[in-house]
């Protein structure tokens, strides 16, 4: 995504109503566009969504099938318990270092890793390629890592509303365990991977799983996947170490939060409050072109591989068609965070990877003090209510 077109700015999360951005609901045509996107135009609308993309772990099904020596493994891997997932990831890391026939259990069914490294698995040297809390070259607002809001979705859905420290503690602990698992089993051991590095690791076959948006992965920006790789993409849910006791939200159960991909907004469009009349008119015209014309819709679904804010998708390639079908089959709704919250979450997450000076990378996994500081910072970023506040 480019930073801006005229005075139309592309952001990774909607900004707060602080006077910096135009209220799009004040323009009759933009208000209609906002309503088409499902936004409340009785309130201030600082940005309109560009579109949504599935957020998950992504695998090349040819590699996955070769590794687990079965065409039936995908469904069992999706339905695996946390314990099975943890053991599988650990086993694959050991296998990468020293290939050998090792049995793993997924959804109660046994699979055996191959006794030797075959051609399809020649470059595999780790399990995960995942963007850390850093900004890549395509971050439109230059400040928030692309995956930050989506990463916290499962924890927020488990905690429910109103958001309290008590309800959020268990889900955050569950997310931390998944982040620890990723870090300990990463295909990248030279610091924190950004979006481009993660995508390159997956494209080269170094990593079994890529965590991120499908739209980013199949984009030709950066390390472009081959047509065969794109056609072979399959999703895996991001499995936080949740238990039933961690779920305060009665709308979701453990299987629902553990076994489905997330559908999250990929970017937002906003117009600066100080844009002159001509620039603001041009920016509004660009938004309306996307929202109301066939060519604009095609740009969203066929070029950017997004699901439109009004729910349409593309079937022009296998990956986009799979995404559109999955929206109907079942997804988790992405977290609704504003830009300030997303930036604060990113900063909180950096504390897991950097020492207190914010510059020096930690040598190995973070300690409990860093984890406690992260949880506190996340609570503050999200405005979680404390028990003391509830008592007053």
Model-based region annotation:
Residues 55-59, 269-270:
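Short glycine- and hydrophobic/aromatic-rich loop-to-beta-strand nucleating segment
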């Amino acid at each position: 995504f480019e930073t801006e077109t005229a005075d139309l700015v592309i952001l990774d999360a909607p900004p707060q109503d602080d006077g910096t951005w135009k209220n799009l609901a004040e323009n009759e045509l933009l208000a209609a566009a906002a309503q088409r996107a499902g936004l409340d135009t009785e309130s201030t609308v600082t940005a309109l969504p560009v579109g949504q993309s599935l957020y998950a772990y992504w695998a090349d099904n040819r590699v996955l099938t070769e590794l687990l020596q079965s065409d039936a493994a995908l469904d069992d891997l999706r339905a695996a318990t946390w314990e099975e997932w943890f053991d599988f990831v650990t086993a694959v890391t050991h296998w990468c270092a020293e290939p050998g026939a090792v049995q793993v259990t997924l959804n109660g069914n046994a699979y055996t890793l191959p006794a030797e490294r075959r051609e399809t698995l020649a470059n595999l040297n780790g399990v995960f390629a995942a963007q850390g809390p850093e900004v890549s070259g395509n971050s439109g607002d230059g400040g928030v890592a692309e995956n930050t809001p989506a990463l916290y979705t499962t924890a927020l859905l488990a905690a429910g509303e109103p958001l309290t420290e008590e309800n959020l503690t268990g889900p955050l602990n569950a997310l931390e365990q998944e982040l620890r698992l990723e870090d300990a089993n990463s295909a990248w051991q030279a610091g924190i991977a950004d979006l481009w590095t993660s995508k390159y690791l997956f494209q080269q076959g170094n990593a079994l799983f890529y965590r991120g948006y499908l739209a980013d992965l199949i984009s030709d920006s950066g390390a472009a996947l081959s047509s065969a790789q794109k056609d072979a993409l399959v999703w895996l849910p991001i499995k936080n170490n949740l238990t039933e006791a961690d779920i305060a939200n009665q709308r979701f159960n453990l299987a629902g939060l553990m076994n489905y991909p997330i559908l999250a907004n990929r970017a937002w469009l906003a117009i600066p409050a100080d844009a002159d009349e001509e620039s603001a008119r041009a920016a509004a015209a660009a938004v309306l072109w996307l929202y109301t014309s066939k060519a604009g819709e095609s740009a969203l679904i066929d070029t950017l591989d997004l699901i439109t804010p009004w729910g349409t998708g593309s079937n022009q390639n296998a990956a986009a068609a799979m995404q559109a079908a999955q929206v109907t089959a079942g997804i988790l709704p992405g977290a609704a965070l504003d830009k300030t919250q997303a930036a604060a979450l990113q900063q909180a997450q950096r504390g897991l990877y950097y020492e207190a000076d914010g510059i020096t990378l930690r040598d190995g996994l973070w300690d409990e003090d860093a984890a406690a500081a992260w949880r506190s910072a996340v609570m503050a970023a999200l405005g979680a209510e404390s028990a003391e506040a509830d008592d007053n």
